[in-house]
Amino acid sequence: MIAQYADAMNHGYYASLGVEERDKAFGEDVAPEWRIIQKPAYYALHDFDGNGTDELLIGTLMDGIPTFYDIRSIAGGEAVRLFDASFGYRTNFDVYADGTIKVTWSSSAFESGFDYYKVSGAEAVLLSSQKTMADIENADALQYFKDGAEISEEEYFALDSSYDALGPQPLNWVCVTE
């Protein structure tokens, strides 16, 4: 997988190819959002669940701040995606110092949220899910939910702040072409 990103960088992100040839050249493991931005790709390894197996993260760095595109673990000797989502546009994730993964998503201007996960083996286990929804007739009227139950705006942001207070997981980023 790392080799696919490196090959794309080494070949000018396949910019000289037609659309179909370009899609084939990238390969199925290269994040669609990364293909568009054409910035250097980096990877980091970190054992999130303490089982002795490092998870692989792929991203870019903007002023030293990562934008993540993929996270994988190992199952049966194969690299497996922990999430089905394509990251980098409406869905993104951050990694906290305690190993919690926060997935930030938006399905529309009227619905968005945060899902918090822990890695367990080759799976991402949902800890908590929060979302906010706007009334289609009154965009200023927001409703807040945690795990399906309505909560106050204060509770919604307090939970998110409690995770943010943990700070980011320090990661050692390496350019895929190194």
What do these predicted regions represent?
Residues 41, 67-69, 112:
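Repetitive beta-architecture junctions, highlighting loop-to-beta-strand starts
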Residues 39-48, 90-100:
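Beta-propeller blade termini
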Residues 47-51, 73-78, 94-95, 119-124:
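A short, structured loop/turn motif at beta-sheet edges
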Residues 65-94:
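Extracellular C-terminal loop/segment signatures of secreted glycoproteins
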Residues 49-60, 97-104:
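Acidic/hydrophobic-patterned starts of short beta strands in beta-sheet-rich repeat architectures
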Residues 61-65, 107-110:
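Short glycine/acidic-enriched loop and turn motifs that connect beta-strands
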Residues 1-9, 98-178:
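Acidic, small-residue rich beta-repeat scaffolds with periodic aromatic anchors
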Residues 1-37, 78-89:
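Blade-edge motifs of beta-propeller repeat domains
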